[in-house]
Amino acid sequence: MISFLRGTVAHVGLSSAVIDLNGAGMSVNATPQTLSGLRTGEEGKLFTSLIVREDSLTLFGFSSDDEREVFDVLLSVSGVGPRLALAVLAVHDPEAIRVAAHTGDGKAFTKVPGIGPKVAGRIVLELAGKLVPHGTGAAAAPAAAASAPWKPQVVAAMTSLGWSEKDATSSIDKALSDSPELEAGGQVAEILRATLRWLGQDGARAGNRVGSRG
């Protein structure tokens, strides 16, 4: 793995830079913020992540090791490739991403071009527990999120599947009234599955009630 590059900056473009390493030019993709810190002809250093594909090797560069760490974690989300992960870092700094993932703030991710509610919900769901804020940002989360940090994540996942926030919240509460042990465990995936099961059973009960009236 290429952990970082340090060399003379040969070129800075709109979405990438070229670092001269002893006569070899290494092309590195980066965010506008990272590129703005580089000056042609001067020494530059970028932390890097190498993406290996069957037909290509692509370097992505970052101004800090923290940015690279968040980038690599974002890549663990199904459907999120390196370009989209880089776009997230172009809109939010690493700490803001950590806070959004930790508090289940799916709306923060929809501010990124190319990310709609469905993908944002998936990001929040799959990053649960993987990104924890370093600073005080988590303290600014709503009190409800502090007492039940899993709840915004489950709500975001359900809204991405088509439910309104009000219906999602109500369904979660009703499902957990049948399975209180899940609330104590606070596992996002398990609570989401239990809520979806409850919705299916409630739909079946509603169908039975309609059938009995007919």
Curated annotation (Swiss-Prot):
Region listing for Domain II, in residue ranges: 64-142
UniProt-listed Pfam families: HHH_5, RuvA_C, RuvA_N
Region (Flexible linker): 143-153
GO biological process: DNA recombination; DNA repair
Region (Domain III): 153-214
GO cellular component, one term: Holliday junction helicase complex
A molecular function (GO) term: four-way junction helicase activity
Gene3D superfamilies xrefs: 5' to 3' exonuclease, C-terminal subdomain (1.10.150.20), DNA helicase RuvA subunit, C-terminal domain (1.10.8.10), Nucleic acid-binding proteins (2.40.50.140)
Region feature Domain I, mapped onto this chain: 1-63
Family: Belongs to the RuvA family.
Quaternary structure and interacting proteins, as annotated: Homotetramer. Forms an RuvA(8)-RuvB(12)-Holliday junction (HJ) complex. HJ DNA is sandwiched between 2 RuvA tetramers; dsDNA enters through RuvA and exits via RuvB. An RuvB hexamer assembles on each DNA strand where it exits the tetramer. Each RuvB hexamer is contacted by two RuvA subunits (via domain III) on 2 adjacent RuvB subunits; this complex drives branch migration. In the full resolvosome a probable DNA-RuvA(4)-RuvB(12)-RuvC(2) complex forms which resolves the HJ.
Protein name per its UniProtKB record: Holliday junction branch migration complex subunit RuvA
Species assigned in the record: Arthrobacter sp. (strain FB24)
